[in-house]
Amino acid sequence: MRIVMILVALLALGGCTRWAMNSHLNNANRAYAQGDCDAVMYNLSKVDRESRSRRYVQPEVSMLRGQCLERQKFYMDAVQSYQFIITQYPESEYAFRAKARLDTLHQLGHDNLAPPATPRPASR
């Protein structure tokens, strides 16, 4: 009987964690709709902490983070978020959306603001 009680308690705790994660993700989406990127980033950091074992949430979190970075004009950081989605989750719908965002940023000229640095040997 004790084993059954312990299993029920563990299942209940797992459900609470998932509920809290979904709540934070919903709050992040609501804040994004209102244009409050600080609240978005705060809620996404909570989702990150609570979803370490749930990798399926990461593409959605990264996509929302990239969109907020774009809104704040941190284009290179947004590009890196989108590239992360494409490399880590190439088959997800978020990879398709990330490619579209990268195309848009490229058309607007925000994807490569400065040429990459070329290393040169120090002169003696």
Regions inferred by a protein language model and the residue ranges of each:
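Sec-dependent bacterial lipoprotein signal peptides
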Residues: M1-C16
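Bacterial Sec signal peptide processing site at the extreme N-terminus
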Residues: L13-Q34, N43-K46, S51
